[in-house]
Amino acid sequence: MARFRGSNWKKSRRLGISLSGTGKELEKRPYAPGQHGPNQRKKLSEYGLQLREKQKLRYLYGMTERQFRNTFDIAGKQHGVHGENFMILLASRLDAVVYSLGLARTRRQARQLVGHGHVEVDGRRVDIPSYSLKPGQVITVREKSQNLDIIKESVEINNFVPEYLDFDADSLKGTFVRFPERSELPAEINEQLIVEYYSR
């Protein structure tokens, strides 16, 4: 399945979650798009709820179905709770960490920064958004990319960095200190529904 490339605003309103991370999509119209959006009261089936939750998380991270399912399967082979492991793996992706450090205003921008080669891990350029970080690894912006407006503006307005990360705004240097705990990740996602979806 290809990555969704339509309107993130409409998709955010349909799923009830901000896919950009800014929350602007839901400020004025916190309901589904379309003529009947404000009055939609359709009750979803159990399968519908599971599917919607899966789509929310997949679109949030901008992943193809194959990438998403592969990560889910990897999480299932780890010790611990499958759903929580899955959420932690997603949050440990390089593009997700670049976004969480405040180097990009949206997750899509973070994917682009990584994909275009603006980011280094432990001093080596990494252009794979799905690159999985390990505790202790250092994320930096390449020297020739540090004056990009998109990065400077993002860092300037960002006022929160999760506790599992460390960030020096002056040097644009971040450290993946540890794996996040579930409580530090998106609370609007019910990952158990996703586990149930793939267990059908």
UniProtKB/Swiss-Prot annotation:
GO terms for biological process: ribosomal small subunit biogenesis; translation. One of its GO terms (cellular component) is small ribosomal subunit. Pfam families: Ribosomal_S4 (PF00163), S4 (PF01479). InterPro entries: Ribosomal_uS4, Ribosomal_uS4_bac-type, Ribosomal_uS4_CS, Ribosomal_uS4_N, S4_RNA-bd, S4_RNA-bd_sf. Signal peptide: none annotated. Gene3D superfamilies: Ribosomal Protein S4 Delta 41, Chain A, domain 1, RNA-binding S4 domain. NCBIfam families: PRK05327.1, rpsD_bact. One of the primary rRNA binding proteins, it binds directly to 16S rRNA where it nucleates assembly of the body of the 30S subunit. Part of the 30S ribosomal subunit. Contacts protein S5. The interaction surface between S4 and S5 is involved in control of translational fidelity. Belongs to the universal ribosomal protein uS4 family. This is Small ribosomal subunit protein uS4.
